[in-house]
Amino acid sequence: MTSHHAPTRRTVARGGLAGAAALLLGATPALTAPAAASGPAGSGPDVASGGRGIRLPAPTGPYAVGATVRHLVDPSRNDPWAPEIGVRELMVTVLRPTATGRGFPRMPQLTPGAAEVFTALAPLVRPHLPAAGADWAATLTHARTGAPPLPGRRPVLLYSPGGGDSRAMGSSLAIDLASHGWTVVTVDHPGDASEVEFPDERPGRDPIRTTVLRPDMDAGTFRTMIDTRVADLRFALDALGLDRVGLYGHSAGGTAVAQALHEDPRVAAAVNLEGYLDWADGTLLPVAREGTDRPLLLAGTDGFRDDRLDRSWWALLAHGGPVARRQLADSDHWVFTDYAALVPQLQAAGLMTAAGRAEMVGTLDPRVSVPAVRKLVRSFFARHLPAPR
């Protein structure tokens, strides 16, 4: 790993600002994810429903982790991908340290409905993934649905996934951070996420929305995606009553969190996991053009070689300030996600090729890459937004 150094408040539907903020303290019941069968820590199914179940690595912190799912609605914005809906909706998962997860079911990575949709979408959004043979509904996370949080306030981190990915594909890192004492909120961005499941129907949309992104995404679509994500993150801060947070995001999510750091003083620090800092035409984002006086980590891989990424990152680094760059060796773009652990299992099962694995996550053993990514992100926030122990 190498190193280079160099609001406006909106109305919140569905429960109101006070209720949403209380969610972070565990004082208000929230919409919970469908239950999954419980099992011992570190266990997971090998084969289920005729397909191969794949396991996520256990968290490393001293706390068990509880999970709740929340539906947030911003009536002040329309959805840019589906204007007929009339509002902008988000789905988020709130992960918090808990004294014990005993007696509470493990949260599935994907609900049965989302897994069914993702099975069809997987080889389209990520061409190296198998079209059959993987039972995406069988994978359990290490968070416990409905487990009560520890009392008191804790620093909050928000996660924005990459374009074409759902928040579910960032579960492992988020749960690990929560096990070390942070409250972590993973955010779906409906319209560009692979699939987002809602608790109800609404005129203009089905219970599960799928991605509008296509391989030939143009410059205008990329700009809409980033602008919408930044607005989503800022709305989530409004909705949850937060005033000093950390953000981290992968790919397009990394782009969004870096720009949100620039725009919103409530963001104390951010981690950009291999996201561009310019628009598709090469015009620098304001954060890269003007620099930042708040901590920002730029983390990349040696497998994702891209002149555009390097140019936009170096433009920001040239300003100096509390910005650092790190690089993971023998890795590629999706090593920062759950795919770091899942893809090698799919390859071992004969469902992916070695070349497909290398193009997605690199050749590094997940027993090395997963701890490396966790330590990288955790140590950054431990310095700039430490969690109580």
Regions found by a protein language model. Give the residues of each.
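The feature captures the conserved acid-bearing segment of alpha/beta-hydrolase catalytic domains
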Residues: 269-333
